[in-house]
UniProtKB/Swiss-Prot annotation:
Residues 1-52 form a transit peptide. It comes from Capsicum annuum. Its EC number is 5.3.99.8. This is Capsanthin/capsorubin synthase, chromoplastic. It is an enzyme of class 5 (isomerase). InterPro entries: FAD/NAD-bd_sf (IPR036188), Lycopene_cyclase_b/e (IPR010108).
């Protein structure tokens, strides 16, 4: 839902592997108003007059690097030592670097391209970024969101939604890191080594950098984090485009969170049958009458829904909506692992971001949560490394892992995983019934659920309300399809309470 979205070969020829995070052709997100005329001129020869021919259009935006005078690790030194080494300079990694370094902790961020623009598109609820003091990093807001449950029912959500400006957010975090004297090293990390009170990384250029704590913020595909349980994740799969179109049917003051309608598959019986069993929805951000971000999304599937299947459904949907794509500015492919077990707690490498288990198991949202939890993890790190006793080794690992995942937060996550397991059991009609009831509850509860703010008690209240106010068919779905996930949830909650 939030598109968590690195250059990728032709998506028509490639099928993603399960550990892929998300991949895009481009990283530049042009301003939807200021560059309108120049885009029309520049992309004129690449445009098309055919319905849905966006599959044949090469994205036109070019990768962009930021002009920031960051401080690099001195390569003349034989040995580089830091308190904290962060692998990756995505949103979670930079946010943690910013938060830890402001307490005087020596931080080094290692990434193959620290100044490159993030390829991801991020959508957040405006109130989430307001609470974090990051509202100035939003470049477009919609006062209302809508959910098309079916052709005959639409929900209007009075909760403003925003698109994150990747450039503004990364510049803000980088500039804070510069002020706090964070060092950067341009390389890919190949190995992580551990001694009793010190760890080190080995980079692809042979460089070794040592530190008291290594934090993996490199994303879902990382091999540095260990698990002690089978990784039975669900997968969110999506194909998205930022496109110039002749026109589109969306209201400019409304962000379309979900469109579960399937009338576009009326002449596609094969696709319709599959969509009935494993549904996908359209997510749309309209910026003006000729610029829109469109994304066909499988909310969660296991095994992973075919990426080609998602693209075929998007072709049929845009054709039905009468959307003619003139040019594709950006194209993104998203594969997010959701739910499943947490990493082994504790372990020698700390994690933040996609590999840490903080992605919302029922929705795929993560960026706002990463921004909120990085200060929490930073506090646990500073309490150990910033103390006069300088706690290191196994005690440090125990403190930081339990700082990010205390027992109450683990129990809450189990409830969200139950939500994911429920979604996996539902077909299109069951999914419609669930969201019809979900968005009718007190906004406090659905706001809190989607923003990972509810306690176990509040989640129990939400569940009882949903069951009590759902249709009889929805109740039947819960009773007949969700018994096993419910028993598993209760067992896991009991274990976490020990």
């Amino acid at each position: 839902m939030e598109t968590l979205l690195k250059p990728f070969p032709s998506p028509l020829l490639s099928i993603p592997t399960p550990n892929m995070y998300s991949f895009k052709h481009n990283s530049t997100f042009p301003n939807p108003t200021k560059q309108k005329d120049s885009r029309k001129f520049h992309y004129r020869n690449k445009s098309s007059t055919h319905f849905c021919s966006f599959l044949d259009l090469a994205p036109t935006s070019k990768p962009e690097s930021l002009d920031v005078n960051i401080s690099w690790v001195d390569t003349d030194l034989d040995r580089a030592e830091f308190d904290v080494i962060i692998i990756g300079t995505g949103p979670a990694g930079l946010r943690l670097a910013e938060q830890v370094s402001k307490y005087g902790i020596k931080v080094c961020c290692v990434d193959p391209s620290p100044l490159s623009m993030w390829p991801n598109n991020y959508g957040v609820w405006v109130d989430e970024f307001e609470k974090l003091g990051l509202e100035d990093c939003l470049d477009h807001k919609w006062p209302v969101s809508c959910v098309h449950i079916s052709d005959h029912k639409t929900k209007y959500l009075d909760r403003p939604y925003g698109r994150v400006s990747r450039k503004k957010l990364k510049l803000k975090l980088l500039n804070s890191c510069v002020e706090n004297r964070v060092k950067f090293y341009k390389a890919k990390v190949l190995k992580v080594k551990h001694e009793e009170f010190e760890s080190s990384i080995v980079c692809d250029d042979g460089r070794k950098i040592s530190g008291s704590l290594i934090v993996d913020a490199s994303g879902y595909a990382s091999d540095f984090i260990e698990y002690d349980k089978p990784r039975n994740h669900g997968y969110q799969v999506a194909h998205g485009i930022l496109a110039e179109v002749d026109n589109h049917p969306f209201d400019l003051d409304k962000m379309m969170l979900m469109d579960w309608r399937d009338s576009h598959l009326g002449n596609e019986p094969y696709l319709r049958v599959k969509n009935t069993k494993e549904p996908t929805f359209l997510y749309a951000m309209p910026f003006d009458r000729n610029l829109v971000f469109l994304e066909e999304t499988s909310l969660v599937s296991r095994p992973m829904l075919s990426y080609m299947e998602v693209k075929r459904r998007m072709v049929a949907r845009l054709r039905h909506l009468g959307i003619k794509v003139r040019s594709v500015l950006e194209e993104e492919k998203c594969v997010i692992t959701m739910g499943g077990p947490l990493p082994r707690i504790p372990q020698n490498v700390m994690a933040i971001g996609g590999t840490s288990g903080i992605v919302h198991p029922s929705s795929g949202y993560m960026v706002a949560r990463s921004m909120a939890l990085a200060p929490v993890l930073a506090e646990a790190i500073v309490e150990s490394l910033g103390s006069t006793r300088m706690i290191r080794g196994s005690q440090l690992y125990h403190r930081v892992w339990n700082g990010l995942w205390p027992s109450d937060r683990r129990r809450v996550r189990e409830c969200y995983c139950f939500g994911m397991e429920t979604l996996l059991k539902l077909d299109l009609e069951g999914t419609r019934r669930l969201f019809d009831a979900f968005f009718d509850v007190d906004p406090k509860y659905w706001h809190g659920f989607l923003s990972s703010r509810l306690s176990v008690k509040e989640l129990a209240v939400l569940s009882l309300y949903l069951f009590g106010h759902a249709s009889n068919l929805a109740r039947l779905d819960i009773v007949t399809k969700c018994t096993v996930p419910l028993v598993k949830l209760l067992g896991n909650l009991a274990i976490e309470s020990l």
